[in-house]
Regions:
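Metal-dependent phosphoesterase signature
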Residues: 36, 253-272, 297-302, 306, ...
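Active-site neighborhood of HAD-like aspartate-dependent phosphohydrolases
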Residues: 242-287
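N-terminal glycine-rich phosphate-binding loop and ensuing alpha1 helix
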Residues: 7-71, 272
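Substrate-recognition element of Asp-dependent hydrolases with the DxDx(T/V) motif
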Residues: 63, 274, 278-314, 325-334, ...
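Asp-based, Mg2+/Mn2+-dependent phosphohydrolase catalytic module
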Residues: 305, 309-326, 334-365, 369-404
């Protein structure tokens, strides 16, 4: 892609909807606006501004209504955060559609629209590519909601086109949740009627009819300050964690011959440097998770009980060295079962992500096979491959140095 094409794709403004009262956060919001709710002693909006900056977007327009001076006094012109922040203050009773319409003169031709209470480490480059390739008026980000984390409000076609948007979340067979992070063409804002209306309820159904709204799906759980029920998970997510995922066979232990498996504990044999690598990670405060395909379970070569005993041997030998891994995730399915967990699918990574409130975009995946790397990339991890030139210990030393 040449520089002109890159420039044409670049989005230069983020718009944050931040005008609501935040009723579900009372009594905090009796005196403070929701975006300033402290998560680990940092106002939530700081995390959003930092993320926007990581997308190389440096112009931020914040749409305010409730206690606007609290936010303007705190953020100022944005220079402290390395961005340029401007504001549009509309009447308190304005809904999101009217709030966007009120700010029309300040909105760029194309912009990133965010909710002030949601955070997700999205793949922004994919979102942007989808927006351009689909020629959509709006490209929203949708959480897949495989785990029924909340009620879905979308129905999607296979190509990502939004077939139904249900603000009330009442219809059957919905799949996916709109979490914001929408790339928007300004023409959509111009089409908002001159009345006090909700942006999504008013505009999305019209775009659905025209086939002009698409979704980029993320499997990564999103985090929120929308209600107190979500706060604890959000606080856990934003705690600093250093994380490494390790493949098993061929990465930390000797790989069996093709189509063969480690079928007994005595067949599990550590690769040179693997235990030392795990000790080095633990010494430097990393969480360590094993991610392994074990189709031998489906094929009858070993039972789950035997697999457990193999992993127990691994645990015991690590404990003798004064360390251990934090958890093991395995896929017991055969290659043709169509599961989401078997690598190169990233299901085990997202299972770990949800269980431990991890940020996969800040995590590493080390494997010895292209399927490992593909799974890690689908999960948004930083990937490293063990090969003849790079042992697991070499790679771990590099990661430890990078994360100091």
């Amino acid at each position: 892609m040449n520089n002109n094409e890159n420039q044409n794709k670049k989005i230069n403004q983020a718009v944050i909807l931040a005008g609501g009262i935040g009723t579900r956060l009372k009594p905090y919001t009796d005196t403070m606006p929701k975006p300033l709710y402290p998560i680990n002693n940092i106002p939530f909006i700081d995390y959003l501004i930092h993320q926007i900056k990581s997308f190389e977007i440096y112009n931020v327009l914040i749409l305010l209504g409730y206690l606007p001076e609290k936010i303007t006094n705190y953020l100022g012109d944005g220079s402290r955060h390395g961005v340029n922040i401007t504001y549009d203050i509309a009447p308190l009773n304005y809904e999101t559609g009217a709030r966007l319409k009120h700010a029309i003169s300040k909105i760029y031709d194309k912009f990133l629209l965010l909710y002030c209470d949601n955070y997700c480490p999205i793949d922004y480059s994919k979102l942007l590519n989808d927006f351009c390739n689909n020629n959509s008026k709006i490209q929203i980000t949708a959480y897949s909601n495989r785990d029924n984390y909340t009620k879905s409000n979308l129905k999607l076609e296979k190509d990502g086109r939004v077939a139904k948007y249900d603000k009330r979340r009442e219809e059957a067979n919905l799949y996916g949740v709109d979490i914001g992070y929408a790339l928007v063409d300004k023409s959509v804002v111009l089409s908002i009627p001159e009345k006090n209306c909700n942006f999504e309820s008013e505009v999305y159904p019209q775009l659905v009819k025209k086939g002009e709204i698409f979704a980029t799906i993320t499997e990564h759980r999103y985090y929120s300050v929308g209600s107190f029920e979500r706060i604890q998970l959000t606080e856990e997510f934003f705690k600093t964690k250093k994380v490494v995922f390790l493949d098993r066979d061929g990465t930390i232990n000797k790989r069996p011959l093709k189509a063969c498996y480690v079928e007994r504990p005595e067949e599990f044999e550590w690769l040179p440097g693997a235990i030392e690598a795990i000790k080095l990670l633990k010494k430097n405060g990393f969480l360590i998770f094993i991610i392994t395909n074990q189709p031998g379970v489906a094929r009858g070569n070993l039972t789950k009980e035997i697999l457990y005993s193999i992993h127990q041997k691994m645990h015991n030998e690590l404990l003798e060295e004064g360390v251990d891994v934090d958890d093991i995730f395995y896929c017991p399915h055969n290659w043709n079962e169509g599961c989401f967990c078997r690598k190169p699918n990233p299901g085990m990574l997202f299972e770990a992500q949800k269980k431990y409130s991890l940020d996969l975009s800040k995590s590493y995946f080390i494997g010895d096979d292209e399927r490992d790397i593909e799974a890690g990339m689908k999960g948004g991890c930083k990937c490293r491959m063990v090969d003849r030139e790079n042992t697991i210990l070499d790679i771990v030393k590099e990661i430890v140095a990078l994360e100091k």
